[in-house]
């Protein structure tokens, strides 16, 4: 199997919007609203200009299966990720996180809704530990030195 991360380009807006508007993804996102096409295109244009926010497409054997975003927060880098709905149940979230972090150092952070069992398992199997819970959110951290 071949694995690849590549930075997103504007032309990825369509697949990213499709994944983001999937009902399961929406339910597990901070903002569960249906995202409109023009709003999403504007978001992608802005994201591509930001220096402290990077997003990648993850491919397995040349098939795009997910995306991971890394936001530099100063004290830590926050990760957020989506697996293509066509790929659910294959443990690709865990694989994507592990491979993404393989050569990285520092503190990493993610926020996951308590009902998002697949993302919880992916984060915990990737070495993240719970640092706090508030309301419907679980906060995770991973220190890689």
Label for each model-derived stretch:
Residues 22-25, 34, 49, 88:
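Residue-level marker of structural boundaries
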Residues 24-44:
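Conserved GNAT-fold acetyl-CoA-binding loop/helix
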Residues 32-33, 56, 139:
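Sparse recognition of residues in long alpha-helices and their boundaries
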């Amino acid at each position: 199997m071949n694995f690849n991360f590549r930075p997103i380009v504007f032309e990825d807006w369509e697949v990213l919007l499709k994944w983001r508007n999937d009902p399961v993804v929406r339910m597990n996102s901070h903002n569960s609203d249906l995202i409109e096409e023009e709003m999403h295109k504007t978001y992608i244009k802005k994201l591509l200009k930001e220096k402290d926010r990077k997003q990648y497409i993850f491919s397995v054997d040349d098939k795009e299966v997910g995306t991971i975003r890394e936001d530099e927060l100063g004290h830590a880098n926050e990760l957020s990720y989506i697996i293509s709905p066509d790929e659910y149940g294959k443990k690709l979230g865990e694989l994507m996180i592990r491979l993404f972090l393989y050569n990285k150092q520092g503190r990493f952070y993610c926020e996951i809704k308590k009902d998002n069992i697949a993302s919880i398992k992916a984060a915990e199997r990737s070495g993240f530990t719970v640092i706090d819970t508030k309301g419907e959110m679980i906060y995770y951290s991973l220190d890689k030195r």
